[in-house]
Regions:
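Nucleotide-sugar donor-binding patch of glycosyltransferase catalytic domains
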Residues: 101-155
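Short, Lys/Arg-enriched, disordered terminal segments
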Residues: 8-13, 43, 147-155
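Alpha-helix N-cap/loop-to-helix initiation residues
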Residues: 26-27, 57, 138
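Short glycine-centered, acidic/aromatic-flanked micro-motifs in structured strand/loop junctions
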Residues: 20, 50-52, 134
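Mid-sequence helix-capping/hinge segment at a functional interface
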Residues: 1-27, 31
Length: 155
């Protein structure tokens, strides 16, 4: 399969971003699914950048870090620090939220996870960014994301 990701893959920076927080619950991807992704990434020389703002996102980070000790938190109070860290990353997996759109705007390769939102209105515009769209976020099986990650040279 050709998902159109950048050909240089992740070898240049070895960091991936998990953008998980959203202003609406129905746009959030289930924690257990994120854990499956983090567990899959345990076998690779990758750091997982987890943006954190508030207690819920801090708890999310702690759960991911239990599964994959390479996960690190990025405080999101300072936009310049966010951009500086995102510039060190090669790839993102994110729900429909502002930080995911920032990743996309910075030109990172990645996967947008869409539930109730219409990606044709707010989705990515670059060929190296892909969308998984289901009516409910719980319908996005982590195995589909893992399949796409394999195309990004994770295996």
């Amino acid at each position: 399969y050709d998902y159109g990701f950048k050909q240089e893959g992740l070898d240049k920076k070895n960091k991936i971003i998990f953008v998980h927080g959203s202003s609406r619950r129905n746009k959030e991807y289930p924690l257990d699914y994120w854990k499956k992704l983090a567990d899959h990434l345990n076998d690779f020389n990758l750091d997982i950048c987890v943006p954190v703002h508030g207690e819920n996102q801090l708890n999310f980070f702690k759960e991911i870090n239990k599964i994959n000790s390479r996960a690190f938190k990025l405080e999101t109070e300072n936009f310049h620090k966010i951009k500086e860290e995102f510039d060190k990353c090669s790839f993102f997996i994110g729900v429909d939220t502002g930080l995911t759109h920032i990743c996309a705007g910075l030109g990172l390769s990645g996967i947008f996870l869409f539930g109730p939102t219409d990606p044709s209105k707010v989705g990515p515009v670059f060929d190296h960014q892909r969308v998984i769209k289901k009516s409910e976020m719980t319908e996005i099986n982590p195995s589909l994301i893992i399949k796409m990650l394999k195309e990004e040279s994770f295996e």
